[in-house]
Amino acid sequence: MAQVRELTKGGVHHAFEVLGRKETAEQAFAMLAPGGTATIVGMIPFGQKIELHGFDFLRERRIQGSSMGSNHFRVDMPRLVEFYLRGRLHLEDWISAKLKLSEINEGFANMKAGKTLRSVIVFDA
């Protein structure tokens, strides 16, 4: 977080946590500038709590949740598909690993351990 605060000369105005991990939610909040907002999009496991320092709220920092990315499926999904088909949305860049069905257990273990973020099972044609 120190490097982010240094590069931005005091922190970011908006930070988005999208992995669903306790550590990255805490990091998103820690890198905020005074008055900044951290939005938690990722699904942090049920029952897991994040830890924040009360002092940081004196700097008017905020943290908020997001339900399903606050999307509107009927409007957003057709637009996202169109962006993908036109080459404006590069979904392949979001894939950490491509797996065979026989590797699913290893892939799940890697995801759970934080070694990969998004795996895709590839079936032979």
Report residues per predicted region:
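Glycine-rich cofactor phosphate-binding loops and adjacent beta1-alpha1 units
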Residues: 1-62, 125
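C-terminal hydrophobic helical "lid"/dimerization subdomain
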Residues: 6, 10, 14, 26-30, ...
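Active-site-adjacent beta-strand anchor residues
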Residues: 18, 66, 97
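Rossmann-fold dehydrogenase core element
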Residues: 36-39, 51-93
